[in-house]
């Protein structure tokens, strides 16, 4: 067997015994096939295995050719935000709910993984969003999102008054609970629940979805991925404001801050089995009607 990968990382934070068992089986399977295996240190102690290599997620990104994420999309998003900083490919075994980003079925994962490790795969690059919050004193907070950047109030059902500019041109003003700015990857997540369109994963676009707008004419807007979105607040907003990245990183705001969202230079490098079909994934996960 030709080795396309020499060092493989196992990552993910298992919540269930079934997921933990998959970690153990995967480690044993890879070691028996002669791979150098590094387990994420946050999960290594739960496995209770002897003589294992473990390290931080960042060091797995530096040292490994491939990372296998065991879990659902939440685990994938958490790992991918860090791993996207490094030259590493990522594939997932689904131990969550929907699993849009975790291709491998746990029942057939090892056969699928054998084929992938034998070279039967293709690579798909998914772009990330970068959000930059410029404070009144000139300092900036910067973070990234794979699915979406969300502007929202700190409390439920609080209206926010703001303006949206695209490439320095005024686009629209908004009075709503917030705004979702989504990648194609995120278009099947929170964006979809808010009434946004599904964007094919390879599309170079992002979508802006108002959250509970106080108007009947507000609709989602699809723009080019090279666009820069600028959010400007109505002064003296008394509500607590926040920016959320993939619902995992929360950044505090005030009405004097300026928000810029654009395509990041980072990419998520996903590995897919050769028989992967995006539309089959949509049909399966969203329970679309089958062919006649």
From Swiss-Prot:
Q: What does the UniProt record say this protein does?
A: Involved in the regulation of the intracellular balance of NAD and NADP, and is a key enzyme in the biosynthesis of NADP. Catalyzes specifically the phosphorylation on 2'-hydroxyl of the adenosine moiety of NAD to yield NADP.
Q: What does the entry list as the binding residues for NAD(+)?
A: 73-74, 147-148, 158, 175, 177, 188-193, 248
Major enzyme class? transferase
Official protein name in the record: NAD kinase
PANTHER family reported for this sequence = NAD KINASE (PTHR20275:SF0)
Reactions mediated catalytically = NAD(+) + ATP = ADP + NADP(+) + H(+)
Q: Keyword annotations for this protein?
A: ATP-binding, Cytoplasm, Kinase, NAD, NADP, Nucleotide-binding, Transferase
Cofactor(s) it depends on: a divalent metal cation
The entry's localization annotation reads: Cytoplasm
Which terms under GO biological process does the entry name?
NAD metabolic process; NADP biosynthetic process
The gene name reads: nadK
- State the family it belongs to: Belongs to the NAD kinase family.
Q: What is its EC number?
A: 2.7.1.23
Q: Which GO terms describe its cellular component?
A: cytoplasm
Q: Provide an example Pfam family for this protein.
A: NAD_kinase_C
Active-site residues per Swiss-Prot or TrEMBL entry: 73
